[in-house]
A protein has these predicted regions:
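Beta-propeller blade termini
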Residues: 44-53, 73, 93-102, 142-151, ...
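Beta-strand-rich domains and repeat architectures in extracellular enzymes and scaffolds
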Residues: 37-64
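Hydrophobic beta-strand segments that make up the repeating blades of beta-propeller
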Residues: 59-62, 108-111, 157-160, 206-209, ...
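Bacterial N-terminal signal peptides
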Residues: 9-20
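Blade-edge motifs of beta-propeller repeat domains
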Residues: 21-41, 73-90, 122-139, 171-188, ...
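A short loop-to-beta-strand structural motif that recurs across blades of beta-propeller domains
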Residues: 68-71, 117-120, 166-169, 215-218, ...
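Glycine-aliphatic tripeptides that mark coil-to-beta-strand junctions in extracellular
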Residues: 55-57, 104-106, 153-155, 202-204, ...
Length: 383
């Protein structure tokens, strides 16, 4: 597996346990929803990290209709201590974190699809951010990966552009600057971009979904920071988010991918050499988008949970250790879950869940009990 910095928790690779019931967040009449935090209008992406180096997990959320990213600083008890926002370009649909200037603090970068730009904010070390630069030359950037592609100790950036149908790779200079060094085909209408290590060589690989061709493209990384030509794998219609783990127990990284057009989760088995084959399909709710994976029941096995936007519920798939999953009863949530993520927000050693709701313009935290049960975090009435 490619190693990431300790403070960075990427939402797409976290998960939710399945052993207990997940309660619906209660509406507080006259005050909105308890436990919800403002997340910008039509939030579209979230990243979790310790942004102010106080030992507590925080999160940054891209609000696609407000030209801003919202930073929620955690209090270590499952609540939010502060809420700040930062202006970016029009239509921010993705936000991620990486230490672009090498000072040990996670910086933030957003993909602004409407403006055709990428905005980099540098962290001042206290969880406040100063705008460093606006990268141009894009037409429709929709997803980002921040990682050290060439293993020079500096964070680089890959950008999926849905209108250019490419992945653009930028080399970081370790001071907050970036230069475009390569472009790779990504299929028609690339949508989600993620990092993993499918061939177990310790070098970052990239996987990108194509909404136009209903495929994923695997870009195997080389030690010099370049990538091989894409290996294209056909999946179901409209592939969205992915989760990576050894789901089959053979020591190789596999891929679970949600396909919204067929209300299906597709499991692709890896061979440890970068090749993927379709292993199984599992039904979900209607219009699934996010998926997260993790062992939240304490049985040593990774389960999957999918957020279904049109039915406002979660599909829970419990893994049996052979790559097969059993579907547990669906869980209703108050709105359309566009993004899921996880981290130990109340620092009890048990992973918690983050749900981002697009139409409510809010995010909520469910506190995990370590046995698969989750309880919504209740705070003061929202503003």
């Amino acid at each position: 597996m490619v190693r990431t910095r300790k403070w960075l928790w990427i939402i797409l690779f976290s998960g939710l346990g399945v052993g207990g019931a997940i309660p619906v967040l209660a509406q507080n009449s006259g005050h909105g929803y308890e436990g919800y935090e403002p997340a910008g209008r039509f939030p579209h992406s979230v990243v979790v990290a310790d942004l102010n180096k106080d030992g507590h997990l925080d999160m940054a959320i891209a609000g696609s209709a407000e030209r801003k990213i919202t930073v929620l600083l955690g209090d270590g008890r499952g609540g939010v201590a502060a809420n700040h926002s930062y202006e970016v370009g029009r239509g921010p649909v993705w936000v991620t974190a990486g230490d672009f200037d090498g000072d040990g603090h996670p910086d933030l970068v957003s993909a602004n699809s409407g403006a055709g730009t990428v905005t980099l904010y540098l962290n001042d070390g206290r969880g406040r951010f100063v705008k460093r630069q606006e990268l141009e030359g894009f037409q429709g950037p929709v997803a980002l990966v921040a990682a050290d592609f060439d293993r020079d100790g500096r964070v680089d950036l890959a950008v999926a552009d849905t209108l250019l149908s490419t992945v653009l790779v930028h080399r970081g200079d370790g001071k907050g600057g970036m230069n475009l060094v390569a472009q790779y085909p990504a299929g028609s209408r690339p949508h989600i971009l993620a990092q993993t290590d499918l061939n177990r060589d310790g070098v970052v690989d990239l996987v990108v979904t194509s909404l136009g061709q209903h495929t994923i493209s695997v870009l195997l990384g080389k030690v010099d920071g370049t990538f091989e030509e894409p290996r294209v794998v056909k999946v179901k219609r409209f592939p969205h988010y992915m989760a990576f783990a050894d789901f089959t127990g053979d020591g190789h990284e596999d891929v679970a991918i949600v396909c919204a057009g067929d209300d299906t989760l597709v499991l692709l088995a890896g061979d440890g050499k970068g090749n993927l084959r379709k292993l199984a399909e599992f039904p979900t709710g209607v219009n699934p988008h996010p998926v997260v994976a993790g062992d939240f029941t304490g049985d040593g096995r990774l389960d999957l949970i999918v957020g279904n936007r049109s039915t406002n519920d979660l599909t829970i798939l419990k893994r049996d250790g052979t790559g097969q999953f059993t579907r547990l009863p669906d869980v209703k949530v108050p709105d359309d879950p566009i993004v899921l993520g996880a981290g130990d927000f109340n620092e009890d050693g048990k992973p918690d869940l983050v749900l981002v709701f697009a139409s409510l313009h809010r995010a909520a935290i469910y506190l995990g009990d370590g046995r698969g049960g989750f309880t919504p975090m209740v705070s003061s009435p929202t503003r």
